[in-house]
């Protein structure tokens, strides 16, 4: 019910300048993480590094940098705030019922991803470590050893493939333009170019990760499911894989730059 007390509270929260400012911080730190993931992917591709080309690798790189603890706590606050803003805004959006519920579910799914990333960042900020690839393998192993787990894992792969497809479509069709106020002239063209390249690259990376999850399910081998890091390194092992990984690394960095621009110009 749109006029319920809970809806009024949610609307007031979503319009809160403090929460909106923190959500913009969330977009910015998400951009920083993608720039780091992209740079790690490129160093792995050219054989100059061996870090994890995923969120854990990016957080580990932050942890080892000057002022790393402060940066990690900034990531924690930004990710939690962005997750909270997505949940709150899900309940005040206006649209026709079917589309509204689809958008609500999408917002809540994204919120879960950001909050989970915030929890991982919190682990690093408190001096711990975490491995996205290891967590993915562990979760896959648990599923494969449970009744019906193969089907659940395969469906998880299909879901991730769907997300990858959505990112690719959103980039290629420039559907992201409604998310932010695109400036005019050459600056606007640059923002659109970053969005197209960034979303398509992220979509391809997620699609490769999804295929590995599917392979793990079909072969009943959890070691095949290694998340984004494993997906990018598997890509590097293919013919022309080094070039492909460099291009995806550049694309992920483009997505990171787009996130920085979105932090400034997002429609909240």
Predicted segments, located by residue:
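Juxtamembrane inter-helical linkers in multi-pass membrane proteins
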Residues: 176-192
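Peri-membrane helix termini and adjoining interfacial loops of integral membrane proteins
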Residues: 46-57, 128-138, 177-180, 220-229
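Hydrophobic, ordered structural segments
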Residues: 17-18, 36, 40, 67-173
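Short, membrane-exposed interhelical loops at transmembrane-helix boundaries
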Residues: 56-62, 138-143, 222-243
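Alpha-helical transmembrane segments and their immediate juxtamembrane interface regions
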Residues: 152-163, 232-268
